[in-house]
Amino acid sequence: MSYTTFSKKKNNQLKEPMFFGQSVNIARYDQQKYNIFEKLIEKQLSFFWRPEEIDLSKDRIDFDNLPSNEKHIFISNLKYQTLLDSIQGRSPNIAFLPIVSIPELETWIETWSFSETIHSRSYTHIIRNIINNPSIVFDDIISNKNINDRAQDISIYYDELIRITAYWHLLGEGNHKINEKKVEINLKLLKRRLYLCLISVNVLEAIRFYVSFACSFAFAEREIMEGNAKIIRLIARDEALHLTGTQHILNILNNEKNNENMKNTVLECREEAIKIFISASEQEKKWAKYLFQDGSMLGLNKDILCQYIEYITNIRMHAIGFKMPFEKTSNPIPWINSWLNSDYIQAAPQETEISSYLVGQIESEISNQEFKNFKL
């Protein structure tokens, strides 16, 4: 199937599947097959923020006064988050847009990816405000084995989907010889690559950020590195929305009533999908041990974080129809919820530091029924 940026072939977008149908031609939003994506777009747009709005002058003083083990925790998490959002700032667009078939999902993916670029810009804003030479931090990211071991498991699923999709668009289905290697391209393989990639992205949004989030908020609970925590809170709010997006995509694919023709793919990939979750949770536990190798911090240690990883892994897997792999427990760090539930608060923006302010939240649609009790 040859990809085109604008198909002249008329089609009914309400009858197209989310993926592998006809390429989107007219980006129309008056009719939508899955209006959940429109709601996600509206929510993400209302969340718009810039890292420069947050004052980090006190954070520099706080960072200089941190003991060496806490500096290691703080900087290591920033390195890892920078890498994750560097991947997420480009990969959803490259991997998913060429195979998307409905405009609302296409626009959600573009909106999602754009917000990820704000996150990666935020880490630069934080690092250059607390360290004289940011290059010391950034140059270590690629060479740090503890970071790259985890990143590899994320990028491999994106890369495989991108590679197979490129062959499909260029050569079509069939058996091909590429660089002296035999390659079979078919829709079944493409669907498998898509589903596993979506699972991997869901795991990234669901689990991989939360060790870093917990550490940032633990610092702020002690009233230090508070500017950083305000930025991370905004990032966490966005990531929760992105997680909701991938959960909806996966649950739509899982539901036979939606005619997405993914039933067999979901069943065939189930075991591997579960392994992706379990592997990610084990990697995050390993990361927690790496962070706390030189000592714990007040209110948080590797054991508590490992319990938290199991707790959120259970919740995330259950949300997309998988069994909970770990013993069901309560949240070992319940105080984190006040940091993660910030989008429910609406505050007046007298100060630039307000981290829960939403824009574009006026309801402009009014029906005739709204005036039925009015008398003139």
UniProtKB/Swiss-Prot annotation:
Amino-acid positions noted as binding Fe cation 1 in the UniProt annotation, renumbered to this chain: 85, 116, 119
Residues bound to Fe cation 2: 116, 205, 239, 242
Catalytic activity, reaction form: a 2'-deoxyribonucleoside 5'-diphosphate + [thioredoxin]-disulfide + H2O = a ribonucleoside 5'-diphosphate + [thioredoxin]-dithiol
Transmembrane parts of this sequence: none
Active-site residues (renumbered): 123
Domain of life: Bacteria
EC number(s) per entry: 1.17.4.1
Annotated keywords: Deoxyribonucleotide synthesis, Iron, Metal-binding, Oxidoreductase
GO BP annotation list: deoxyribonucleotide biosynthetic process
Cofactor binding, note field: Binds 2 iron ions per subunit.
Keyword rRNA-binding attached: no
Cofactors that this protein relies on: Fe cation
Pfam families, alphabetized: Ribonuc_red_sm (PF00268)
Keyword Iron attached: yes
A single MF term (Gene Ontology): ribonucleoside-diphosphate reductase activity, thioredoxin disulfide as acceptor
Family: Belongs to the ribonucleoside diphosphate reductase small chain family.
Function of the protein: Provides the precursors necessary for DNA synthesis. Catalyzes the biosynthesis of deoxyribonucleotides from the corresponding ribonucleotides.
Oligomeric and partner information: Tetramer of two alpha and two beta subunits.
NCBIfam families: PRK09101.1
Name used for this protein in its record: Ribonucleoside-diphosphate reductase subunit beta
